[in-house]
Amino acid sequence: MRTIALSIALLGSTAAMAANDIVMHRDPGCGCCEKWAAQVRQKFGRAVKIVDDANRAVIHKRLGMPASLASCHTAIIDGIAFEGHVPIADMKRVLAAKPKGVRGLAVAGMPLGSPGMEAPGYPADH
């Protein structure tokens, strides 16, 4: 089943980041985040700066993201926030379209088959 990426309204300003920077804040105890970052690096052809962040609730609050959409990492790409294992194709669509009012996408939890959460018997959701 295809994971649905949910639009989230973010209150914090991420526009100050350079267009080429990809910054991923992650739970330092999580192992899947680095796999997700590796896929992002490969598919975007850009470096990913990984920031270990044990108190992720602070960034979620700053971005105005509801706790119900929280996952193990938050990436900021071209001023748009991506929470959790958002499929890379969906990220590229949002970054290309930059729809008015959409400041980010989220996939809550850690769904099997999503980037970084591949598992035998579950289709890859890219």
Per-region residue spans from a language model:
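Short active-site oxyanion
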Residues: 21-22, 46-47, 78-81
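Soluble non-cytosolic domains of exported or imported proteins
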Residues: 27-34, 50-54, 82-85
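N-terminal signal peptide c-region/cleavage motif recognized by signal peptidases
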Residues: 13-16
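Thiol/selenol-based redox catalytic cores and closely related redox-interacting motifs
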Residues: 61-126
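Conserved helix-turn-beta segment immediately C-terminal to the redox Cys motif
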Residues: 37-57
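Local sequence-structure signature of Cys/Sec-based thiol-disulfide redox active-site neighborhoods
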Residues: 18-43
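Extracytoplasmic/secreted envelope proteins and their assembly/folding machinery
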Residues: 33-37, 56, 60, 88, ...
